[in-house]
Structure formats: structure tokens, C-alpha cells
């Protein structure tokens, strides 16, 4: 961390957890186990120490959003209607975005009773493999040009204006958009949008996804640490795919394990690390809230925008 974070308060885990005194985690160990991603070591103590204070902070931002919306409606002499509260979550592959997103979805739904909380990943806005192949950029999958950013922005605008939207579904098992299937998002009270690209600028530099976010989170760690988690996850995915020929990762189980891991290291070095350093990490200071992880996914520091 450097002067890039001059506009952030740096808060240790010990100081952060003292900002919230509740000792009940709002979920059980079994529920936490069911939502955490492969090789993510999050535990109930992390929920109490990190995520319950974060929920309190989100409540503050939510009240601020409601007050501003109400005041603007009075000023403009327009009818006030409740817009969804949109949370953007970004970070590298394998850093734990999905676990954080699913956990927040559960905690928000239990904190804001009767609220409709939707979770969407930007994977659904990747171009189908067929189009990536046609454009000669299948090896750039995950990079900015592999996403249909216009459709993603249109989706956010639709949701922000209280209109039901239908979006594509991505499957990690087939490594592609699922044909002829759509996810329906019906006017949520909260929308969590998770993906590596949620803070990135658009090519025309006229529209910015951040403009639609009421709160934003970046999950950070040292790059060598993320590489270790990526390789651990790759190995776990191979184990899951071993008996399933339809799984994208099954083909990697047909070569010697050391060759598969060499391939994974090459994918990390030539694709994921390049994407992280060039396109993902430079956007982290656009977040309102940065979660920094050390070894074993242990959250050691928080950065909160001033």
C-alpha cells in the first residue's frame, strides 16, 4: 500500500472488530460452510470480527442513500421511489470474491428483514466462447475486451430504475455461457454485483459502472499469495472433475498431475497475473472499502475511504 491510498483510513483487524459489539454471527457454521468457495478458510470468528461491522457500515450508507434520494425528490418536486442499493465487489480471481458476496447476501437479508437481495456475477456478461473464437480473443477471456460491457451497463441502469431484467448465465463447469437460459432479476432492494471488472472504465470513457454503486468493496492480497490460492483451487477443481467428462477441467485430469500444475502456473503467469496487474489492481482505489488478506485468507487490515 502506498500514496494510492492517501484518501483511505487504514484500520487493523483488532481496531475494526471493536467497532461492533455483537457476538452473534447471524448464521451457523453449517450455513457458512455451504456458501464458502473452494479452499477459502473463512470461519465464524471472521464473520463476527469483520463482516458484522461491515454490515453496520452498509446500514449507514443505506440511510444516506435514502435520505439523499428523498431530499432530491423534494428539491425536484418529483415523486420519490425507493431505488435498489447496489454493491460492487471486485478483486483478483481466487481471492475470495464469491464467498464474500454470498456471505453479504445472507447477512444483509437477515439484517434488513423482508428485503429482496440479489447476487449477480459479471461472468454472465462474458461473450460466448464461439464469439471469442470468432474474434480471435479466446486466450483473452477475462480481459476487458472479452466482456459485453454495454449489456452490463444497460443491466445496471435497468435495475437502478426499478425494472425487471433478464441476463445470461455462465457455467464454470462448461466454461461458457449456458445456451438458452436466462436469470431473471426482479426489482431487488439490494443488488450485489461481483466480478473482476466491476470498477473498470468503459472503452468510450463516457459511462462508468462505479456511478451505479452505492457501496463498493475490493478484496486485496499480495500477488504471490493469490497465485498460491489459485493453484490450490485449480487442484481442487481437478479432483472434482476427475469423474465428470462433461466438466471443462476433466481434460486436465488426463495428463500427469505435475504437467497439469505446470499448465496452471503458466495460465496464472501469462493470463491471470497480467490481467490483475494491468486491469484489476489499478482499480482498487475506486472502492469505498478494501479488505486485505494475508496467509490462509485471514483478513488482517481494512481500508475505508475517507
UniProtKB/Swiss-Prot annotation:
Record keyword Transferase present: yes
Pfam families: PRK
Domain of life: Bacteria
EC numbers: 2.7.1.33
UniProt feature coiled coil, ranges: none
Pathway(s) of this molecule: Cofactor biosynthesis; coenzyme A biosynthesis; CoA from (R)-pantothenate: step 1/5
Catalytic activity: (R)-pantothenate + ATP = (R)-4'-phosphopantothenate + ADP + H(+)
Stored HAMAP family: Pantothen_kinase_1
Keyword terms: ATP-binding, Coenzyme A biosynthesis, Cytoplasm, Kinase, Nucleotide-binding, Transferase
GO molecular function: ATP binding; pantothenate kinase activity
Main location: cytoplasm
Descriptive protein name: Pantothenate kinase
InterPro entries in alphabetical order: P-loop_NTPase, PanK, PRK/URK
GO cellular component: cytoplasm
Lineage, broadest ranks: Bacteria, Bacillati, Bacillota, Bacilli, Lactobacillales
Cited SUPFAM superfamilies: P-loop containing nucleoside triphosphate hydrolases
Location(s), subcellular: Cytoplasm
Binding site for ATP: 91-98
Amino acid at each position: 500500500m502506498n500514496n494510492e491510498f492517501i484518501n483511505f483510513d487504514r484500520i487493523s483487524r483488532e481496531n475494526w472488530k471493536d467497532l461492533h459489539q455483537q457476538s452473534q454471527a447471524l448464521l451457523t457454521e453449517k450455513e457458512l460452510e455451504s456458501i464458502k468457495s473452494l479452499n477459502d478458510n473463512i470461519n465464524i470468528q471472521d464473520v463476527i470480527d469483520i463482516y458484522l461491522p461491515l454490515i453496520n457500515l452498509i446500514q449507514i450508507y443505506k440511510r444516506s442513500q435514502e435520505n439523499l434520494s428523498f431530499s432530491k425528490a423534494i428539491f425536484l418536486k418529483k415523486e420519490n421511489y425507493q431505488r435498489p442499493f447496489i454493491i460492487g465487489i471486485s478483486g483478483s480471481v481466487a481471492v475470495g470474491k464469491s464467498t464474500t458476496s454470498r456471505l453479504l447476501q445472507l447477512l444483509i437479508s437477515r439484517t434488513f428483514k423482508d428485503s429482496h437481495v440479489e447476487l449477480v456475477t459479471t461472468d454472465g456478461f462474458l461473450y460466448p466462447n464461439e464469439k471469442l473464437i470468432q474474434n480471435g480473443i479466446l486466450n483473452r477471456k477475462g480481459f476487458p475486451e472479452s466482456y459485453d460491457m454495454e449489456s452490463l451497463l444497460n443491466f445496471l441502469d435497468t435495475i437502478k430504475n426499478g425494472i425487471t431484467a433478464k441476463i445470461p448465465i455462465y457455467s464454470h463447469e462448461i466454461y461458457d455461457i449456458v445456451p438458452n437460459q436466462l436469470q431473471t432479476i426482479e426489482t431487488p432492494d439490494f443488488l450485489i454485483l461481483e466480478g473482476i471488472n466491476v470498477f473498470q472504465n468503459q472503452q468510450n470513457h463516457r459511462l462508468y459502472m462505479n456511478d451505479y454503486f452505492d457501496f463498493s468493496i475490493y478484496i486485496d492480497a499480495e500477488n504471490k499469495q493469490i497465485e498460491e490460492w489459485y493453484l490450490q483451487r485449480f487442484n481442487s477443481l481437478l479432483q472434482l472433475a476427475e469423474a465428470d467428462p462433461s466438466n471443462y477441467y476433466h481434460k486436465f485430469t488426463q495428463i500427469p498431475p505435475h504437467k497439469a500444475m505446470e499448465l496452471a502456473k503458466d495460465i496464472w503467469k501469462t493470463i491471470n497475473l497480467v490481467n490483475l496487474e494491468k486491469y484489476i489492481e489499478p482499480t482498487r482505489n475506486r472502492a469505498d472499502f478494501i479488505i486485505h488478506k494475508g496467509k490462509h485468507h485471514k483478513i488482517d487490515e481494512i481500508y475505508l475511504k475517507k
